[in-house]
Amino acid sequence: MASRPDGDVWNIVDNDKDSQHYGRNFKFDFSYISSEEIKDVVKDYVWQNYRVGNKSLSSLYNEVKACFFQFIRFADTRNITSLKGLTNTDVDHFISYLHTTISERTKKPFGTGGQRVILNTLKSIIRWCQLHRPNDVPVTEIFTGNEYIGVNRKLKIDFIPDDVVAQINEALKTEENPYLKYGIIILQSTGMRIGD
């Protein structure tokens, strides 16, 4: 079977003898993708990666069934019908969407690891398209690279300069709002940073 299957539902049996899923039938269902343009890109991505052997069938299945599904839910709410028009702002909004989405399975928000996997699936599809279907993705870079910082990376914290802290302390003497005043005092005692 050298050509891509027709239709929105594909049944592919894992025939890799070294795979733990050898002989398992994977039912890929692309019908949840409302945009025909995005659907065609994702089908190509799955088929080419499967045929070449870049990714295991189970990995591709999980990417399409769980991870990319979340992007399509987001895209439908924002009327995104093409990957070509994606911007860094869309990626930021997608990350915010992932922060606030409740998992249907666990009834809890997605953990940071799950959010990273979902975003990496979108990145993987975009990166693949940059090589194989460059006309279907943005020309400019839409990922900053620090969307989800790894745990082993050096954490850089921007501290507030001493002269600014002195100005804050002077202003606290005359601050009338008790919530603001004591909130800043608590932040200072716990290590206030610029981001706070």
Residue ranges and their predicted role:
Residues 1-143, 153-154, 167, 171, ...:
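Charge-rich, intrinsically disordered N-terminal extensions
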